[in-house]
Amino acid sequence: LMRSLSLPLLAVVSLVTAACTGGTAQPTAPTGGGSTPTMVGSSSTSPAPATTIGRPGFCEIGWEPEQAGMVESAELTEISGAALSRRHAGVVWLHNDSGSDPAVYATDTSGADLGRVSLPDLSARDWEDMALGPGPDPAVDYLYLADIGDNNRSRDEVQIHRIPEPEPAISVVEGGETLVVTYPLGPIEAETLLVDPANGDMVIAGKALSGVTPLFSLAGDLDWSVPHEATYLGELDLGTFALATGGDAGSSRVVIRTYDEVFAWERSPGSSLAETLLTQPCRIAAVREQQGEAIALSPDGSEFYTVSEGLNQPILRFAGS
């Protein structure tokens, strides 16, 4: 069984200290008094322990931001999701928020416009995040597009689209898969999708003014031809008004951003996304952007990039020193 993770704003500071000094902090019970959620794929009947951060000094790394460039494309006015390509070095995939045509855009890390890829067979009600992950063909990386926005909490179901990662110069990609998702607790607002690059497991993080962020999971081996109810994992308490606006998962690190901070977890070898989110995150101060929602990890986890909504916004690079 997996306990809900509740990290009050002040408590996170002590968790970061514990992580850097080798201490271990245990997650608290669900703040809403709910039952203990079940970890996906776990047959254990005992709570999963919170583990210490594995890399010495991880929380003490100086994550210094620098402007890598500016977004050139005049079509990118409401960037909400980002993903760094593993196959095409230096390519960043971006997409717009609600009200835009279904399309993804390729830039390089300096913001140079490399092309627009239209996706005419997919719907785009409120795309909020994107991720790179595995799919049916093990030799191919896939772009996951999270149509999970629901400001009014009125959507009975949301969608996650998946396409093979295209070449940046291709203008149209037809087809694609769509996974229809429901939540066990009813409609939620969400802007964060994490996809495990190892097995395609997915975690959706909700968004709330309280900062209490519900987490839901979907197994990577689901049949995408039928709807699925996500599994409730628990919650993160990021602090009042700390809204989860985007995230990314790699083989060594996981990040979830708010408008002001980035919460970063280091992954132990073989750990699942759910297990990783039980460990202590580090808090990294983000540059206050116009409306910062997108974040993307580099393939090796050594750096991440953020970018905001708005025309010709800067691309910020955070590299560990």
What are these model-derived regions, one by one?
Residues 21-23, 40-41, 47-321:
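Sequence/structural signature of beta-propeller domains
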Residues 1-9:
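Bacterial N-terminal signal peptides that target proteins for export
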Residues 22-31:
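Bacterial Sec signal peptide processing site at the extreme N-terminus
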